[in-house]
C-alpha cells in the first residue's frame, strides 16, 4: 500500500521501443483538475476462499483511489469500517494483488453520518480489547461546522477538483512508519489562510489551534508549500526550547525524509540561512539561536554576515507565539527583516484579560496580546471544537476544599491529608492503573515534601511507582538555563537554598535508578528527563514486553511537563497549585488525549477549590459566546447523571430479558433463541458496561475490584451486585465470541445483517489490573490459604471469564483453576510453573488431535507450530511443505491449508501469549 502510494505521486520513466525515455506520473498532482475521474458501482472481486463486493469506487486515471461503503440509517458507520478491515484481512484480497493497492481513502456513511480515513496497514486498526484506530474524520466548513450528510459531503469533498486537490496536496506519506496521513479540515483551512496571506503579502497572522490538534503537520505542510514559492527566500520554523527543536526536526523529517537538518550551533544556523541550496530553504531553529544571530553586539559578527538577507522576503512560523522569549526577539526580527512575514501558532492566545503576569522581582508586567504581535487571526480551532469533534476529551473536575478542622492544622498535616486522598483515589481515576498521572505542586519545596510523604505511604503497603522532576540549580549550565527560561517558579525557587534542592533531586534520581534499573545522575539531567517522559508514554496496556514494574503511576512536577507534553496514557492531573487562564488550560490539557472507550475523559482532582478560575478560563478560551454552553461541552456530566443512565441501562436490559419471558439472570441468557435475540442482548448489555466503565473513574464513588453481594456497588445501584455484573460479562463475552466466529466464518454472499452490523466493543470488557501475573498471584493465595482470600474459587473463575483481555487464554486458566486441589501451599512461582506444565500438556494434546484430524505427521505439525511461535512469523511456504505429503491437487490443497489454519489459529494465539504473529491475519 505505502509503496503504491509513493508510486502514485512520483515521476516515473518509461522507455519506448526506440530507447527514448518518457516521463509520466500516474496522477497529475500539479494540475489535479486535469485528471480523468470515473465511478463504478458494486464491483465484485474474488479472493482465495470467497469474494468481496464494494459499494462505490472512484477511479482517477483508471486507478481505484476512493472506496465508499454505505450502510442503512440507524446502523453505525463503524460497522462499515470493520467490514473494510475484514476485507483487507481476507486471504487473497484485492488490496494486495490487484490495482486496489492504489486505494488512498475510504469513506463510510449511513447517509446521515459520514466519515473518511486513509488506507493503511492492518496493524493500525484493531477491533478487540486493545481497540485503537487511525484517525477517522468528519468533513467541516471553515467555521468548524461538521458536514455529516452524505449528499453535502459528496458535493464538498468528492467533487472532481476538490477530491483531486485533497489527494495531491493534503495527504502526507510518513516513510518511517510506512503510513499515509490526510490533513484534517481545520489544518487545511489554516494552511490555505497562511498561503493566501503570503501570496497577497498581507502582513502577519496567527493560528489559534488548540493543544493536541496537530499543529506540527499544519506547519510542515505550510513550509513545504512555501519551498516551491520562488518569491520566498527562506522559511524559518522557530521553537523556544532545545528539546522542541529536536522534536520538531524529527517530526518534519518523519513527514519528509531529510526535510530539515540540525543546527548544532549558531554558526551552522547562519551558514544555512546564507545557503542557496534548495534543501536549506526550510530551517528549524530555536528562538535563542536566532536571537544570537541577529545580535549586532555578538563577537562572531553574525549580524554583518546576514545583511545580504536584509531585504529578502523571509517567512517566520513560530511554534508557540506567546512564550516569554518571543517578545524580546520580535523587535529584532522586524527591524532586521523589514519584508519578513510572521505567523504564530497558539493553543491559548494572550487576550487583554490574561495579559498581566507577575515578574520574579514581584513587579507587575504585561505580555503583548497575540493580536498586538501578529495583527490578525487567520483561523481558529478551539478546544471546544476539538471536544465536539472527539479529537480531544472533556474534563471531569473534582474540587476538594479543605475541611475547617484541616485549615487549623499545620501545612504538613494538610499535605499528608492530600497525599492520602491521592493514594485512595488513584486506582479509580486511572482505571485500575491502566493510566498514569501528574501531580502539579506550587514549588520545588512542596514537590520534595510530597515525594517524601508519598514514598512513606507506599512503603507501608501501597503498590505505586512514584517519580518527581524539577530543574536543578543552573550553576552556569547553559542547557539548564535554557530549560528554565519558561519555568518561572522553578527558576525562582532555585535561587533559595540551591544546595538543598540539588541534594533532594540527587536522591530522587537515585530512587529512580533503583526502581527502573537505570544509571542517571544530576549532571545528566536532560537524559533523566527524557527517560521519564518516555516511560510515561510507554504506559500502554497490555504490553508483555513492558512489565508493570517499569511503568510510572504518578509524576510530581512544579512547572515541567505542564505544557507541550503529550501522552495518551496520561489521564489524571492532581493539583495543589494555583492555576489560571492559559496556564490552567495548558495543564489540564495534558490529560485529554484520545485513546479509546476506557479513557472517556481527563480527570482533574483540584485540592485548592479553584472552580472560579476554571470557569473563567473556559469562558476565555472556549470561543463560545455563552459560557454555560461552553461548560457543558468542556466538562463531563456529574456522577449522579451517569449513575442514572447506568440504572436506566440496567432497566432496559431487564425489560429485554422479560420480553423473551426470561428471568433477569445471567444463567438465562443461554436460553435466548436466534441471532436477533442474541444481538439484542449484546446491544443492551454493552450499554450497561459502558456506563459502568465511566462510573468506575468517578472519585465520588469508591468501588473495589471484587465485592460481595452484601457490598454491592457501594450505593451506586441496588439493581446488580458485582457478582451478577461479572456473570453477565462472562455470558456477554461467550456470546460475542460465538457471534463473531459465525460472522467471520460466513463467506456467503448474503451475510445475516443482524450479525453483520453488530459492534462488540471488547475494549469495554478489558481490565488493566487483571492480567496474567495478577491471576497467578490470586491463585497462589487461594491454594495457600483459601480461608483468608476474599473471593471463592467460583468468583476467581468468574473474574477470569469476565475480562476480554484474557479471552484467548481464559479457558486454559479456568481449566487449571478447576484442576487444583485445596490447600497445597504453593508459591506464586510454583503456581506459574505448574500452569505452564498444565498448559503445554494441553497444547500437545490439541496438536495431536489436529494432526489426527488432518492426517498430518505429529512431529511435522509440532515443528511447524514451534517455528511460528518462536519467530512470531507465519510462513506460507512452510505450510505448503507441511501439506505436501498428502499429495493433493491445487484446489484440494488450498482447502486443506485453510482448514488446518482455521483449527490452528486459536491455538497459536494462546501459545503466542498476546504477542502478534505477523502474516497470520491472512487466514483470520
Regions found by a protein language model. Name each.
Residues 1-234, 243, 247-259, 278-279, ...:
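ATP-dependent helicase/translocase motor core
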Residues 43, 213, 239-242, 263-272, ...:
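Conserved helicase motor
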Residues 203, 228, 233, 246, ...:
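Catalytic cores and motor modules of nucleic-acid processing enzymes
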Residues 279-293, 548-563:
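Conserved two-lobed SF2 helicase motor
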Residues 281, 407-557:
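Conserved C-terminal RecA-like helicase domain
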Amino acid at each position: 500500500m505505502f509503496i503504491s502510494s509513493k508510486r502514485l505521486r512520483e515521476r516515473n520513466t518509461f522507455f519506448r521501443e526506440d530507447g527514448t525515455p518518457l516521463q509520466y506520473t500516474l496522477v497529475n498532482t500539479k494540475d489535479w483538475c486535469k485528471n480523468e475521474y470515473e465511478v463504478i458501482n458494486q464491483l465484485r472481486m474474488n479472493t482465495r476462499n470467497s469474494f468481496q463486493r464494494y459499494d462505490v469506487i472512484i477511479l482517477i486515471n483508471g486507478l481505484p483511489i476512493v472506496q465508499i461503503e454505505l450502510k442503512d440509517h440507524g446502523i453505525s458507520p463503524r460497522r462499515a469500517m470493520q467490514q473494510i478491515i475484514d476485507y483487507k484481512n481476507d486471504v487473497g484480497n484485492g488490496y494486495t494483488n490487484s490495482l486496489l493497492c492504489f486505494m488512498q481513502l475510504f469513506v463510510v456513511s449511513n447517509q446521515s453520518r459520514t466519515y473518511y480515513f486513509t488506507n493503511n496497514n492492518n496493524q493500525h486498526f484493531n477491533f478487540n480489547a486493545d481497540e485503537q484506530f487511525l484517525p477517522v474524520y468528519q468533513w467541516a466548513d471553515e467555521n468548524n461546522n461538521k458536514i455529516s450528510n452524505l449528499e453535502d459531503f459528496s458535493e464538498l469533498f468528492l467533487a472532481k477538483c476538490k477530491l483531486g486537490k485533497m489527494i495531491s496536496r493534503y495527504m502526507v506519506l510518513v516513510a518511517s512508519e510506512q503510513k499515509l496521513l490526510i490533513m484534517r479540515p481545520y489544518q487545511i483551512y489554516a494552511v490555505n489562510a497562511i498561503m493566501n496571506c503570503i501570496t497577497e503579502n498581507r502582513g502577519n497572522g496567527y493560528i489559534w489551534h488548540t493543544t493536541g490538534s496537530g499543529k506540527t503537520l499544519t506547519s510542515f505542510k505550510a513550509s513545504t508549500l512555501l519551498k516551491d514559492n520562488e518569491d520566498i527566500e527562506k522559511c524559518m520554523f522557530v521553537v523556544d526550547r532545545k528539546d522542541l527543536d529536536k522534536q520538531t526536526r524529527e517530526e518534519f523529517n518523519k513527514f519528509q525524509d531529510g526535510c530539515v537538518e540540525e543546527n548544532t550551533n549558531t554558526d551552522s544556523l547562519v551558514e544555512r540561512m546564507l545557503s542557496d541550496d534548495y534543501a536549506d530553504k526550510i530551517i528549524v531553529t530555536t528562538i535563542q539561536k536566532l536571537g544570537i544571530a541577529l545580535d549586532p553586539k555578538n563577537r562572531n559578527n553574525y549580524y554583518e554576515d546576514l545583511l545580504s538577507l536584509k531585504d529578502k522576503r523571509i517567512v517566520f512560523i513560530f511554534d508557540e507565539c506567546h512564550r516569554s522569549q518571543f517578545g524580546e526577539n520580535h523587535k529584532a526580527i522586524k527591524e532586521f527583516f523589514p519584508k519578513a512575514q510572521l505567523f504564530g501558532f497558539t493553543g491559548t492566545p494572550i487576550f487583554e484579560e490574561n495579559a498581566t503576569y507577575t515578574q520574579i522581582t514581584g513587579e507587575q508586567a504585561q505580555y503583548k496580546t497575540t493580536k498586538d504581535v501578529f495583527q490578525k487571526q487567520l483561523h481558529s480551532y478551539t478546544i471546544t471544537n476539538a471536544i465536539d469533534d472527539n479529537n480531544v476529551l472533556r474534563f471531569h473536575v473534582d474540587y476538594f476544599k479543605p475541611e475547617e478542622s484541616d485549615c487549623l492544622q499545620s501545612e504538613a498535616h494538610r499535605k499528608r491529608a492530600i497525599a492520602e486522598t491521592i493514594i485512595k483515589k488513584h486506582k479509580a481515576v486511572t482505571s485500575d492503573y491502566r493510566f498514569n498521572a501528574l501531580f502539579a505542586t506550587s514549588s520545588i519545596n512542596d514537590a520534595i515534601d510530597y515525594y517524601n510523604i508519598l514514598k512513606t505511604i507506599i512503603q507501608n503497603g501501597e503498590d505505586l511507582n512514584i517519580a518527581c522532576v524539577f530543574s536543578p540549580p543552573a550553576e552556569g549550565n547553559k542547557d539548564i538555563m535554557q530549560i528554565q527560561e519558561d519555568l518561572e517558579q522553578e527558576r525562582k525557587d532555585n535561587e533559595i537554598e540551591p544546595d538543598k534542592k540539588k541534594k533532594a533531586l540527587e536522591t530522587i534520581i537515585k530512587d529512580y535508578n533503583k526502581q527502573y534499573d537505570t544509571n542517571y545522575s544530576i549532571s545528566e539531567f536532560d537524559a533523566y528527563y527524557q527517560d521519564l517522559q518516555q516511560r510515561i508514554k510507554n504506559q500502554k496496556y497490555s504490553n508483555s514486553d513492558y512489565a508493570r514494574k517499569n511503568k510510572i503511576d504518578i509524576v510530581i512536577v512544579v512547572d515541567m511537563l505542564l505544557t507541550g507534553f503529550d501522552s495518551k496514557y496520561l489521564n489524571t492531573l492532581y493539583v495543589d497549585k494555583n492555576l489560571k487562564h492559559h496556564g490552567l488550560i495548558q495543564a489540564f490539557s495534558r490529560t485529554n488525549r484520545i485513546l479509546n472507550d476506557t479513557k472517556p475523559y481527563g480527570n482533574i482532582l483540584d485540592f485548592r477549590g479553584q472552580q472560579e478560575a476554571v470557569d473563567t478560563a473556559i469562558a476565555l478560551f472556549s470561543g463560545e459566546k455563552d459560557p454555560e454552553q461552553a461548560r457543558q461541552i468542556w466538562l463531563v456530566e456529574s456522577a449522579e447523571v451517569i449513575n442514572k443512565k447506568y440504572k436506566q441501562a440496567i432497566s432496559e436490559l431487564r425489560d429485554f430479558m422479560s420480553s423473551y419471558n426470561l428471568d433477569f439472570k445471567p444463567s438465562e441468557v443461554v436460553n435466548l433463541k436466534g441471532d436477533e435475540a442474541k444481538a439484542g442482548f449484546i446491544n443492551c448489555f454493552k450499554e450497561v458496561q459502558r456506563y459502568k466503565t465511566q462510573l468506575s473513574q468517578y472519585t465520588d464513588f469508591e468501588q473495589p475490584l471484587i465485592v460481595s453481594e452484601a457490598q454491592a456497588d457501594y450505593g451506586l445501584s441496588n439493581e446488580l451486585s458485582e457478582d451478577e455484573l461479572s456473570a453477565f460479562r462472562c455470558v456477554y463475552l461467550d456470546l460475542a465470541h460465538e457471534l463473531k466466529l459465525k460472522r467471520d466464518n460466513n463467506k456467503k454472499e448474503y451475510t445475516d445483517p443482524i450479525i453483520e452490523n453488530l459492534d462488540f466493543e471488547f475494549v469495554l470488557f478489558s481490565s488493566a489490573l487483571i492480567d496474567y501475573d495478577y491471576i497467578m498471584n490470586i491463585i497462589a493465595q487461594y491454594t495457600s490459604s483459601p480461608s483468608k482470600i476474599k473471593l471463592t474459587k467460583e468468583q476467581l473463575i468468574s473474574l477470569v471469564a469476565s475480562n476480554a483481555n484474557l479471552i484467548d487464554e481464559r479457558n486454559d486458566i479456568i481449566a487449571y483453576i478447576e484442576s487444583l486441589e485445596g490447600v497445597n501451599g504453593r508459591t506464586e512461582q510454583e503456581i506459574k510453573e505448574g500452569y505452564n506444565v498444565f498448559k503445554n500438556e494441553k497444547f500437545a494434546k490439541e496438536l495431536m488431535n489436529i494432526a489426527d484430524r488432518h492426517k498430518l505427521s505429529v512431529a511435522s505439525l509440532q515443528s511447524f507450530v514451534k517455528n511460528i511461535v518462536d519467530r512470531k512469523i507465519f510462513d506460507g511456504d512452510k505450510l505448503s511443505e507441511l501439506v505436501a505429503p498428502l499429495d493433493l491437487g491445487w484446489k484440494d490443497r488450498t482447502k486443506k491449508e485453510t482448514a488446518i489454519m482455521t483449527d490452528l489459529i486459536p491455538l497459536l494465539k494462546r501459545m503466542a501469549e498476546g504477542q502478534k504473529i505477523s502474516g497470520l491475519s491472512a487466514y483470520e
